[in-house]
């Protein structure tokens, strides 16, 4: 039985995590971290990890960048593995996470969905086959409450394509102020915010006389919660290091 601490338990993903973990037999929620002390469906909630008093085998974080940064020293001091699901992290904070992984197990992915990670592999394969004759555009869509744009997932997809091509591409987020032809070595990334869109990512390979579209649509947050829970159970048994969805999928 894996004892899980949820940082951001009061948010949308926190509630979904609690509901899904309650249906499993291999893990349970022993505590939550949120803005103030309290209780959620019988689960003790604290405003700081420092109040945990040694509880838990692993942390699942769906919070905010500032909360992630505050959690890192505690996790390191208590050798507590952490699954970082929060996006919009600064380069400095991402570097701190990499450094932390030398001391404890850390799982980090911009998107915890199995399907998105399959999409990432398909994008890499498509870019390798199609080559430079196809322009690449990424369009991501989310609900209005999502703060970061473009999404971490859109950047993850762009990075996957770029790594497959030895870093040949640069990213363009806004063409409104640019009066010039499109650079063949750019990946355009556009963000849409509206309605109740959970998450939609579309990658277009635009070539001579044809367009190939690869797309993933999330219809509920359950897919992200399920991936995070599986990652937590997986990570609790690991040695220090930086892990991601590809590592976990490879060991299934």
Cite the ranges covered by each PLM segment:
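Short glycine-/small-residue-rich Rossmann-like dinucleotide-binding loops
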Residues: 63-64, 87, 191-193
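N-terminal Rossmann-like NAD(P) cofactor-binding module of classical short-chain dehydrogenase/reductase
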Residues: 59-60
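Rossmann-fold dehydrogenase core element
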Residues: 81, 96-113, 131-136
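Rossmann-fold NAD(P)-binding glycine/threonine-rich loop
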Residues: 72-73, 77, 86-106, 117, ...
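Rossmann-like NAD(P)H-binding beta-loop-alpha module
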Residues: 118-133, 149
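Hydrophobic beta-strand scaffold residues
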Residues: 29, 45, 82-83, 106-108
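C-terminal substrate-binding/catalytic lobe of Rossmann-fold NAD(P)-dependent oxidoreductases
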Residues: 3, 7, 12-50, 56, ...
């Amino acid at each position: 039985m894996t004892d899980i601490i949820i940082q951001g338990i009061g948010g949308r993903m926190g509630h979904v995590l609690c509901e899904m973990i309650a249906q499993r037999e291999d893990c349970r929620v022993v505590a939550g971290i949120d803005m103030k002390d309290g209780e959620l469906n019988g689960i003790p909630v604290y405003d700081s990890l420092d109040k945990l008093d040694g509880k838990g085998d692993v942390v699942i974080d769906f919070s905010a960048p500032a909360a992630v940064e505050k959690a890192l020293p505690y996790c390191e001091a208590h050798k507590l593995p952490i699954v970082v699901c929060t996006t919009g992290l600064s380069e400095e904070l991402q570097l701190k996470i990499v450094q932390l992984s030398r001391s404890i197990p850390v799982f980090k992915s911009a998107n915890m969905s199995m399907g998105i990670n399959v999409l990432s592999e398909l994008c890499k394969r498509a870019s390798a086959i199609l080559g430079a004759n196809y322009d690449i555009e990424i369009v991501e869509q989310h609900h209005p409450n999502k703060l970061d744009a473009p999404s971490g997932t859109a950047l993850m997809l762009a990075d996957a394509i770029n790594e497959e091509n030895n870093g040949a591409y640069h990213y363009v987020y806004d063409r409104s102020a640019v009066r010039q032809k499109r650079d063949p070595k750019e990946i355009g990334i556009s963000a849409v915010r509206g309605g109740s869109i959970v998450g939609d990512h579309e990658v277009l390979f635009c070539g001579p006389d044809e367009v190939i579209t690869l797309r993933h649509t999330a219809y509920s947050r359950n897919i992200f919660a399920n991936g995070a829970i599986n990652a937590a159970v997986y990570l609790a048994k690991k040695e220090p290091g930086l892990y991601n969805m590809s590592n976990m999928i490879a060991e299934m």
